[in-house]
Amino acid sequence: FFKHRHPGRFFDVGMAEEHAVSFAAGLASQGLLPVVAIYSTFFQRAYDQIIHDVNLLRENVVFAIDRAGFVPADGETHQGIYDPAFLSQLGMPLYAPSNYQELNYWLQQLLSDRFHGPRAIRYPRGGQDTALAEFGCTGEDYDFLRKADDATIVLVSYADELADLLQAERELQQKSIACDVIKAVKLYPFTDKIIADLSKYKIILFAEECIANGSIGEHLEYALQQNGWNGRFIHCAVRNACLPHASVAQIKQATGLDAAHLVQAVQMAVTKGENLL
């Protein structure tokens, strides 16, 4: 679509991700604002250029990361589970919209004067989940999707994993376990506000379609502890870096990121409790 409307502003470099990033850095150094659209799984090929050509020089580049999270049907090599971990190491602003409205809004924001330097937005393969489309876009860094007056447990996630989180919340409610639900849009860096809001809870479950080591959840737990929080943090993420060729539902079940496993994780935390509730 963009290529046909703006042929002079579209450059297809083929399967040369390293060149794509260095090329974008050169454009940015001349005052342009390039958008680099690459699959998450191929984005890692350009990590050297992301660090040295863009991040260290604070070049004005927007990274649009496609196929983020679990990817069905494309094989083992196409899982987009590493970019939150390796981008958060650079302190780069990272956003993960959960529906079309958020994607449209935040991409426009990243292209505005509100930001300067490298920044990234990630989105999954396929269309939006109907369960998430209804929430629209508030323009906030995070939103409460469910909020109870007496909840001491909060479930947090981003992008497509939120659908399973909402299903888990409904099942927990039926078991008389009240949980709030937070939809994160800005993944990193964390704001003081979200740290303050999360610090009010005794149990936090953070679920993400990402490798656990270096992930958003791992950074969040550390930030909370540095802020003096001493509650129970449940991190549901990918512990085995090699995922099989399978459907998203099968991968979620295998990695413990389906609603059933999330419910079980919260129930175990409540049962063990350590007098937190």
What does each model-found stretch correspond to?
Residues F1-G117, G127, E274-L277, ...:
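Thiamine diphosphate
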